[in-house]
Amino acid sequence: MPGPRASLPSLSAVDNVCWRCCSSSSGRPVPGQRLRGFAIANQARPLSTSPVRPLRFGATTTVRAAASQSPRPNGAYFLSNVLLERFGGFQFSPRSRAIAGTSGSNISNTKRNATVAAADIPPSTSTPRPQVDEELPPHRRRQAARRTAEQAASASSNAPSEAAQTTPVTPPPAAPSGEIPPDASSILSNAAAAQPAQSLRRRLTTLLALSKPRLTMLVVLSAMVPYALYPVPDFLTPGVSAPSLSPLTLLFLTTGTTLCSAAANALNMIYEPKTDALMSRTRTRPLVRNLVTTRAAVCFALFCATTGILALQFGVNPTVAFLGAANIVLYAGIYTPLKRVSALNTWVGAVVGGIPPLMGWAAAAGESAVGDGSWRELLLAPDGSSAGGWLFAALLFTWQFPHFMALSWGVRDEYRAAGLRMLAWTNPARNARVALRYGLVFVPLCVGLCAVGVTEWSFAVTSLPVNLWLARESIRFWQTQGAAGSARGLFWASVWHLPVVMVLALLQKKGMWGRVWRSVFGEPDLDDDLASDDGWEYLDESEEPPAVTTRS
């Protein structure tokens, strides 16, 4: 039952009201002498039947929107402010009561108006949405939901191995567009955890994850390309009178390099499982998730190291075997512990990346060695034939810096939390300068490969676009200090740069297309012409031929 109505004002208090407007708002003619009849008519037929929405204090725009939904002007609109203040905000419709109830803090007699509004308006049954959802834009809400899902996935990935063996582990969600995606070891660890316990496939996948397959593949390719580009007359064709490259040597080179790289990567994971657990890219690696024991990982690393060094020793030459062993020691014994001590670890890691090209070049040089085949002849030849190997080593050494500086920038906070000293957080300005400095060296390095006779001069032209692309991204990374997506742009430019340069060098090896042309069209070789003239005797035309006498 509605509460008591407020007493009606006298005619003298409402003498400023336009009765013609009041008559049009009520919908029928109302005598000017009967104000009560006008109020009762408006209460009997409300101006709006839409549900009442709760209002917030200070939300003037919401009040205007609610008033604009009514098809007719409210009758209270034509009363003076003095009249409303005198009678406590007397209202003509339920909507007006709701408005007066929310703004009653500024009007007298608020307690009585609140009682009337509560009696006339039914309680709302709808649940209001949280204020956070109303204020945040849609893409911010999606990012918050994605972060919540990632936190739940990381919490489940750190569970004990027994739980992983009983229930399949789903891979974590894809990384946001601004982050570096997880490495191959983390992806393989998720695949191994989804396999049945004690299965052969689970064990093999776990061991493959220990070897860091993507990094190992890059190391092997960086050794194969210099081996194939070594300047010899014949390409993968056995010969007796001329030096050549042997497919069997190439097989031992790739096998030994793969095993040495797998051993170094496994030892790296054995050394820092606690550090890997603190970083998003490495928190799902095998040792972090207890997919393999430390003892089994050590046995795997020792087996790969021993087998790889022996394959290089007996299948290639002792110089290449020494370089493979040095690569393991530098990466697992010096680079990995140095990451907690000094930012110079990046330069040590770059030296590790420059060793595989020297291994490939020394393997090819051993096939055509004419001396004792020592490391001086293979790597420091007096005639300068080893310059191509050192240029390839410099190319891989230089490439490490723009690639890693961009990669570490995206996870610099995680490096700091893990206690790994990287320039990305210890000295961001120097981090950008180093990336710029080494990003501008690729053009002269490619020209140097043409100058020493490893590739054709066309290689300097065809490699120019990709070199300029990397140089531009390095300049942008330096100018913005890694902001505005420059770090990610430099990272992907470096990812594409190295394979493109290697493929272009292989396609433009010095003299390769000339030999292909002669083999297809059968044009005579200059050496063949000289050899065919050895049995002929040439006479000097200036000399007179001997006189021939005949007897008559």
UniProtKB/Swiss-Prot annotation:
| Signal sequence region | none
Topology with respect to the bilayer: Multi-pass membrane protein
Could you tell me where this protein is found in the cell? Mitochondrion membrane
* CC per GO annotation: mitochondrial membrane
InterPro entries xref list: Protohaem_IX_farnesylTrfase, Protohaem_IX_farnesylTrfase_mt, UbiA_prenyltransferase, UbiA_prenylTrfase_CS, UbiA_sf
GO biological process, alphabetically ordered: heme A biosynthetic process
Q: Where is this region: Disordered?
A: 118-185
The entry's function note states: Converts protoheme IX and farnesyl diphosphate to heme O.
Record-given protein name: Protoheme IX farnesyltransferase, mitochondrial
